[in-house]
């Protein structure tokens, strides 16, 4: 019998879930910190960590693979030129989740996802 394996479906169809994750990853790389529910951020964290790991080696192949996921050229350039060099020596754990407590309206667990070394200073 198949059991739930791999990831949280977030109560959405696959196309909606993929679009949500892409948009949230782009927002994370643009602002270096995002606030949302804990369930969404744990899924976004998985994708963001994989993309940063791949971006640490700047090759044409890696740029093309990441551009399948990130369609914004500015964010793609920022990932390869500003974000990934900061994490060259780090083996993993590029992001952190800070729990905020429950949202007032529906008591959903809220959290902040941010890049660990925020020395980019591009705000």
Curated annotation (Swiss-Prot):
Q: How does it assemble?
A: Part of the 50S ribosomal subunit. Contacts protein L32.
Show the GO MF annotations. structural constituent of ribosome
Listed name of the protein: Large ribosomal subunit protein bL17
Give the family per the record: Belongs to the bacterial ribosomal protein bL17 family.
Which SUPFAM superfamilies does the annotation name? Prokaryotic ribosomal protein L17
Q: List keywords of the entry alphabetically.
A: Ribonucleoprotein, Ribosomal protein
Q: Name one GO cellular component term.
A: cytosolic large ribosomal subunit
* Gene Ontology biological process terms, A to Z: translation
Protein's UniProt keywords contain Ribonucleoprotein: yes
Family annotation (Gene3D superfamilies):
Ribosomal protein L17
Source organism superkingdom: Bacteria
- Which NCBIfam families does the protein's record reference? L17
Which InterPro entries did the record assign? Ribosomal_bL17 (IPR000456), Ribosomal_bL17_sf (IPR036373)
Q: Which Pfam families match?
A: Ribosomal_L17
Q: Tell me what gene encodes this.
A: rplQ
Asked if the record carries the keyword Ribonucleoprotein, the reply is yes
